[in-house]
Amino acid sequence: MKLGVLIFMMLALAIGETSKLFAYEEQQKLPTLKEAIGSKVDLYGNLAISQKNGPSYEFFENILPPPRYVNADFRYYPMVLSAPQARVKARLVSNGSGINLRGGSRSWRDVGLPITFRVGPDEFIFGSLPERVTSPQWLEGWLPVASIDYVHPSPFQTEGGVPIDQKANSREMETYRFEAFADTSNFGSEHGLVMVRFSLIKGIQGKVAVQTEESKKITFTNNILKNSENQTLLMTDAKWIIQRGMLHANLKKGESATLAIFTKTPENDSFKFDTGSFDKHLLKTIQTWRNLIAQATQVEVPEPRVNHAWKNHLVQNFMLLQGDKMNYSASNQYEQLYSAEGSEAVLAMLAWNYKELSKNLMIPILDFSRKGLEHHQAGIKLLDVIRMWAITGDKDWVVAMQPRWEKELQLILNNRNQQNGLLPKERYCGDISTPVHSLCVDAKAWRSLKDIQPLLADLKLEPLLTQVRKAEKEYGVALLKAVRASIRTETDPPFIPIALFDKEEPHSPITSTRIGSYWNIINGFVLASRIFPKGSKEENYLSDYIEKHGGIFMGMTRSGGTAHGFWTGAERVNPLYGSRYSMDLLRRDQPDKFLVGFYGMLAQGLTRDTFIGGEGCTLDPVDAGGRFFYCPPNSAANGFFITMLRNLLVHELDSDDDGEPETLQLAFATSRRWLEDGKTISIQKAPTSFGAVSFNMKSKLGEGRVEVHVELPEKKTPAKTFLRVRLPDGWKIQQCKSGEEKVTVLADGTADLSKFRGALQLEFLVSK
């Protein structure tokens, strides 16, 4: 029997041992994917809410396989490896097949020299067989040290030398472990240095090979691989030799071989790499990331996956930063700044307590401009500055930025036309050039005039404040008049168009056309503007229409309308654009619907275990292992998830609509499972416009109580402060007290803490 055939047979025997396929077709008592896609309501989301204790990750986990594939030659999604804020970034393919491999299509940018990894005596590309390769894992669940295992057995006898009386011989098949991280030293950051370790964790004898594009023009001397121009491509430990234009290392069980790969070639060979270098640099890199995450608001919930996700999303965004520029992605067509998406990511960092960093990151956004979207950007930039001022309280920064933000303010004040009081027509959205009077643009601009008034008062800019107040009132009247004249009442609920005065047809199903999909993607700005008065009949028209006409899937924003989507399929989700819809759910106090989006994103909007998102992902699976998604990773997708987590724990509300929050809501949308007996919810030093807030919630259901320690903000006292204890189904709160003082508590577990100040100890007495 030929060696190749023997190896193939041995591989076939390993399928059951290593396969990790997602049995999405075997879900019981669930609508089919076709039924769910065809429904105008969120079938899976509604079913999740009906489960005991409400939505959960486990409910969504196996309905579909996760995002896994991209429209690149390397097919498996890429993982960016970078030092914090480094300008040079490496690309690891998530099946372990190589580093800095070329994408091929126009969507992907080439970075560094492609390095391909091969294993076994047949030099098979690592990770080629999906049933043999594990999904990548981060160290401790979140640290950016990737680990991937791959089964590829070696023959256990000399070819041809087979004894006549051969006996059956079962043996452990070779399993290789690949580990990689970006070195965070100054040198590593400058050169995109990736350190790699191959280990044989099972089996007897293993072989690893490293291949470059320049296999016939390379030299390998003193463990340094150079190209024909004498540039250093990589360094190795003493395990490696060169054969047939590739580096090779033989491994016995428990042995390792290490490499240092340069994305940007160094100027000289002053950097030293040897057998101990991988571990030495690994320890320093781990400490770098621990120190960075220690600066953030600290959250601990009784769901390790959530704890890993928020830490890793912060790490990812530090890796996507190029200096002070929050790019949308890296090493693809989205390696650039966008005002709306960049703002989402920066404001998420601000919400997690990176105040000084966020001020620096905001400057490139304030300087950004794109023709045809000037008024859209003006509203975004003003709202960004308002939030930065509210959280940091840094008036000096606001004054320093005044030439930038006042230019945007004057654009809104001066460009409204006399005829209808609205801003001039501009692009329907970034991807659709059709000029319209955009409700998205006008609503956002009006809200910025509303919310900037407290800031102008704080800066004592009285003449400008007077001008803004007058304009905001006139603008609000004109905008409501335009919207009410444009609403389509033939649908239930009535349809609110983005294109005012243009007779935009109702989109139903929303994703049946491209324009409908973009209507769905951008209408969050309208929701966030709260243009309709509280309690008015129109207040919930938009959110109700989204939910009843196919705008939501597993709590995530849907899109579609492409007859022949090459990477996407006809139906997909663009979760990151649902941030304002999610915040509106909190405003309307619908925690279970909010959790549908939270867990839908975690289970089906991100890669499994590595938490990497793209701009959008298909709903139809490619195969049982995964679905396509577009140009990952994505800083706004990361920002979306950590913003949801932050707000389900700590949320501010402007109930009186005066442009400034006056209500603080704590733990208003936590999972009921998080307060099962013995579990704890904790958030420490979360920045708000009132100051930092912390709480620790300990469930002692077995003793009939829940204990809560709260540290209320000290910078400014909210007019109203509420804390909610969301108990598992079947449990009720009997009373709440602080010491001997009774605290008013509602049936849903909401306690009124408005009269309290400083640190507070609460006891909720509970029963079944």
List each language-model region with its residue ranges.
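Substrate-binding groove/exosite segments of carbohydrate-active enzymes
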Residues: 288-400, 427, 437, 502, ...
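The feature captures the catalytic groove of carbohydrate-active enzymes
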Residues: 242-278, 372-376, 410-477, 509-515, ...
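Bacterial N-terminal signal peptides that target proteins for export
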Residues: 1-7
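Aromatic-rich carbohydrate-recognition surfaces in CAZymes
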Residues: 251-253, 257, 282-283, 336-422, ...
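Active-site-proximal structural scaffolding
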Residues: 26, 141, 191, 225, ...
